[in-house]
Regions:
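Proline-rich low-complexity regions
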Residues: 40, 180-181, 389-390, 394, ...
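Proline-centered flexible-loop/turn and helix-kink motifs
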Residues: 145, 150, 389-390, 440
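Surface-exposed loop/interface segments of Gram-negative outer-membrane beta-barrel transport/assembly proteins
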Residues: 232-292, 332-427, 447-554
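Short, small/polar-rich motifs associated with maturation and membrane association
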Residues: 1-347, 359-361, 429, 521, ...
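Outer-membrane beta-barrel strand-turn architecture
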Residues: 229, 315-318, 352-356, 436-440, ...
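Beta-sheet entry/capping signal
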Residues: 309, 320, 441-446, 504
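Charge-patterned, long linear interaction tracts outside catalytic cores
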Residues: 425, 431-438, 442-450
Length: 558
């Protein structure tokens, strides 16, 4: 027993000695932070990365901080290169000189028909890098852009898979629509179909001076998307995977059935009418009777989503390449048969240096989206499920759908047996860019690109077979749309530096043209228990089609 007590006392003393020893080893260091000209760096950040303790430099650039032998001080200031100090270099009266980050000053930003140094920009242009969007648990690039730059407002109207968020740059506009112009590797494209893992850089052109080169179509702003290219340094294979769940988080609160009955009685009595519920009925609701929150019954507890991205990149001094494949699967939060979205992406980016004067780059991209949803309007389903009192069960004791008095529909029945709407689209695009160095600083650039977009919607809305059901129609809808767009441009550019001065000029010509075609047809039948192929044909039919061609010729200069 004495041996056990002695071991316990010894262990306790050792534990007490450890923090005392650590306290004795900590010490105070101090210093001053200056720039290369000797001026104090007021507000410079000093952080001990090992203890997460920090401070900032005062009006004279001075600071002091308690450190331990394992401390590493990270000194930083906006526009300057960070500096790390550790070990024996940590002492009193340190003089720390931060060097200007010339790489930030020389950073190139993608603008209309070219690039410019960030320091030379006069328009409102924001640049979004890969690090700001990668790793986000989103299903499309638009969602990944939320919160990345000021003035870019993205709103998600609903949670349905494949829903298109609205994009507004610096507020709303009343000219045609509010969508900004989106260019992907130089040609107009659909931002919804871009794989977020393929992005190298995004530039957002916000004001008139930065968008003027694109004309009136850029009145709502411009989003320029540049995809990744291969590197000559090494070959890489990259695989990314994300898996998660979506959960309804903000559903309307519906009162319990017995509270509804009590409040309903109170409202009727106050208006001079007899009560609708007896005390026995209220007690029945309170003690195991119906208490069904319809809005909660139409949603799943959680809906999984996943994405997989595989890329191969590499090359040598003359040729670089990047090949990427992507897959995304998002389940709908609504109950029903296999509702959700699947997206498939494929991309090839190839660059080749033919000679010291001539090089070219080609991009080929394909995306397929498949979205399956219920065949009714979502507003109808949510509205009916929200207003239904909890005294009515959504299904009876036999599992049959109920149609309470005053309602001829059942939201869950529409989701599970009311048919479906299937939307499929294919987006194929390709570009070829070439550059010829004519003289020192003088270059001739050309680009040709095209996009083929096909969209098909198939809807099979089925009647809900039940005595009290008001959903008695079967409706079959078929829609198809195709657009083919072609873009070409030729530019002559001149860029020359003389010491600290730079001269830049550009003149160009572009052609854009396209062809759009589509049709829409639908049929409606009644008195059928199944679908459009069986039942009495009604006069409610429709057929329509449309087609158009357009072209734009432009000259531009900067």
């Amino acid at each position: 027993m004495k041996h056990v007590i002695m071991c316990f006392v010894t262990s306790l003393l050792l534990l007490l000695a450890i923090p005392m020893s650590a306290q004795q080893q900590s010490r105070l260091v101090s210093g001053v932070v200056k720039d290369e000209s000797g001026e104090p760096m007021i507000g410079a950040s000093i952080l001990d990365t090992s203890t997460k303790q920090g401070t900032i430099a005062d009006m004279d650039g001075k600071f002091s901080l308690e450190v331990t032998p394992s401390s590493k001080l990270h000194i930083s200031f906006v526009g300057y290169k960070d500096q790390v100090i550790s070990g024996k270099a940590l002492k009193k009266d340190m003089i720390i000189v931060l060097k200007s980050n010339t790489e930030m000053i020389d950073e190139l930003v993608v603008v209309g028909y070219g690039t410019q140094k960030k320091v030379n920009l006069t328009g409102a242009v924001a640049s979004v890098s890969t690090s700001e969007i990668e790793g986000k648990p989103v299903t499309n690039l638009v969602e990944a852009l939320q919160g990345t730059t000021s003035g870019l407002v993205i709103q998600q109207s609903n949670s349905a898979p494949g829903a298109r968020p609205s994009i507004n740059i610096r507020g709303l506009n009343t000219m045609n629509n509010n969508d900004p112009m989106v260019l992907i590797d130089g040609i107009i494209g659909d931002i919804q179909n871009v794989n977020p893992s393929d992005i190298e850089n995004i530039s957002v052109l916000k004001d008139a001076s930065s968008t003027a080169i694109y004309g009136s179509r850029a009145s709502n702003g411009v989003i320029l998307i540049t995809t990744k290219k291969g590197s000559a340094q090494k070959n890489e294979v990259t695989y990314e995977m994300q898996y998660g769940w979506q959960t309804p988080t903000c559903l309307p609160k519906v009162v319990d059935s017995w509270i509804y009955a009590e409040m309903r009685n109170e409202a009727l009595i106050n208006s001079g009418q007899p009560a609708a519920f007896t005390p026995e009925q209220i007690a029945y609701y309170r003690n195991g009777g119906p208490n069904c929150k319809w809005i909660e019954e139409i949603y799943k507890k959680n809906a999984p989503q996943q994405s997989h991205n595989l890329s191969f990149s590499g090359g040598n001094d003359k040729t670089t390449f990047l090949v990427s494949l992507g897959y995304m699967d998002q389940n709908s939060m609504f109950k029903g048969p296999d509702y959700g979205q699947q997206r498939y992406n494929g991309r090839l980016n190839l660059s080749h240096k033919v000679s010291d004067r001539f090089n070219f780059t080609t991009t080929v991209a394909y995306a397929r989206n498949e979205v399956k949803d219920h065949a009714y309007w979502t507003e109808w389903i949510i509205e009916q499920a929200t207003r239904m009192p909890a005294i009515y069960p959504i299904v009876d004791e036999n599992g049959a759908y109920t149609f309470p008095s005053g309602s001829n529909s059942n939201a869950l029945a529409r989701l599970e047996q009311g048919g479906y709407r299937q939307n499929s689209n294919d987006d194929f695009s390709a570009t070829l860019n070439a550059e010829l160095k004519i003289w020192d600083g003088l270059k001739l650039k050309g680009m040709i690109g095209g996009q083929l977009y096909n969209n098909r919607t198939h809807e099979n809305r089925k009647a809900i077979v039940a005595p009290a059901s008001g959903d008695t129609e079967n409706r079959m809808t078929e829609q198809f749309a195709r657009s083919l767009n072609l873009t070409t441009n030729v530019m002559l550019t001149y860029d020359k530096s003389f010491g600290k001065h730079t001269i830049g000029a550009m003149v160009g010509y572009s052609y854009e043209g396209g062809s759009d075609k589509g049709y829409d047809t639908y049929r409606v039948t009644e008195t059928s228990d199944f679908d459009i192929m069986v039942g009495t044909q009604t006069s409610n039919v429709g057929n329509s089609g449309s087609g158009s061609d357009w072209s734009i010729y432009s000259e531009f200069a900067r």
